[in-house]
Amino acid sequence: MSILSFPDRGKWGKSSWRGNCSGHIYRELFERLQPGVFIDPMVGSGTSVEVATEMGIEAYGLDLHSGFNAIRDSIANAVGKPGDLVVSHPPYGGMVIYSGKVWGDTPHPDDLSRCVDDDEFHEKLQLVLLNQRDATKTGGFYGTIIGDWRRNGTYTSYQAECIARMPKSELAAVLIKAQHNCQSESSSYRNMRLPFILHEYIVLWQKKGVSTLVLLSNLAHEQYARLTGTWKNVVRAILVALGGEAQLKDIYEAVAKSAPDKLVTNDSWQEKIRQTLNQNPSLFASSSRGHWQLAA
């Protein structure tokens, strides 16, 4: 069945942790996909890992609250082995503010619930998904649990944007997850003609045996007009994979090694990388000539 509904969240994790996903959802995924190794890069209160461990699955949970940053740190390096299933459940749209509210006393700059706008969120979540893909075995599955949001007359479909920003050749399934016990002000929806959103999506991709950079470069060519942030994420993904900093020549080499022929034969691709590095000081910093790193 592609529609999942579990009113009871189960015994796993913390019921007080707002936005926590029902453990029955994870159990359903594990029963279907039978992963030997499961990774959750945004584990929150630990529901997913508790379910996996109970089912005898080798599980790894990472999170901002334990010092792991899915935007800046390599999931593959942190875990030390690839996963059969790598699934995240990010905070989105500011509906549930994570850092400084659910966890910790102060806001975290890479907390996805604190993005300044949807554009920033879309770019950052794409980078997280690419990070998840890199940590997934060939033939394994990676994905995210995410919903939509309507506010101030604007409907944002986060799952549609995720699908548009990831390789269509790897999209494996979109499951609908019913939402229960949502916190909302009923008066806010009294005069609405359109229904209140009571569902999320579980979007799954199956990794094929090609590099993330090949897929990204294809996306850059196919959707250049729409995805202006793709080149930034190509360079960011390279720097994450190289440990957060690298010589310009090493960045070139990584692109040349992984990119398709139509990219490496383009006379301007090195110029595009330099342009991306130089025009985005909030993302990239140079400590010396030819040496680049992720901005603090």
Residue ranges of predicted features:
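Class I S-adenosyl-L-methionine-dependent methyltransferase catalytic core
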Residues: M1-T276, S286-R289, L294-A296
